[in-house]
Amino acid sequence: YVPDYLNEIVEQLVLLWELDTSTFVYGSGKRKSKEQRHYEHLTTFCQKLQEYIQKIEICGPNRNSYSKTDNSATFMRIKTDYMGNDQLLPAYNVQIGVADEYIAVVDVNHYRSDMDCFVPLMEHFKQTYGFYPQYPVADAGYGSYNNYIFCEQNGIEKYMKFPMFKKETKDQKYHEDPFRAVNFRIDEQGVMRCPNDKAFHFLYRKNVRGNQYGRKEELYECEDCSGCPYAEKCKKTDKNRTVRINQELTSMHQEVIENLESIHGALLRMNRSIQAEGTFGIMKNDRWYKRIVRRGIHSVKLEVLLVAIGHNLYKYQKKKMRNRTAA
């Protein structure tokens, strides 16, 4: 139903029953008629439906919550006390790009995930400077299929970690686990086989939900897991094991590992941890900027931008004074 349709039904009932709303009774000791009860129920439905439509329009398609006091803010998990206990509070996701210790670009979003903030930040960088950065180094919160495809389409190198990067590179036991699908043997006919030499057959291919570039996953099922001596280590159910594989994403992860494990990648990672994280540390702890005081995403962007400008001016003056003293 839509509010207009329900309003038409209410109008038809008023004409059919010849209702006069001025004769309706309210309060204790008054008995409402059947017609009045039906009329009030329908009008309540119309009001609630209109309210829900308005809330959905405010929320938009890219988030599932908003604050009543600031419709642009989204509820996020935030560490608020010295014990690290997090609470669900309205907040914004502030993104900065740092180059040579200066804040080069600032962006504010109401997305809860950093993965959704990468592309807007890169577009904002290009809008400001006329080109995309060649080596955007980021932590594991930014490495996704969408962001990697965006980098390929715009000539950007992939230097963003993916969520399992640390486990892939630091945990040798996990990396060489023979029961992981990526470590299964491929025979001469191109068939994937598990450690028990059982073949995995292709079932179907499905689209990954919420992916704008049409990412697809292939599902394979083992031909027979009955009596397998590795069943306890290999699978968690009584059925034949199924695996999901995306060769394109797997190759992207391997490329990211090669980039970040190189000497150039190690230097970039070191600089990112010093400059980007250090900049946030200076803003929060040295400048005591821990809470946004304005409301509305446009006002918040202006506030954060002014803080970034102040940081850059302070950094420039300090460098200038150090160079003058050294000379």
Where are these regions (language model features)?
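Anion-binding and metal-coordination hotspots
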Residues: 1-327
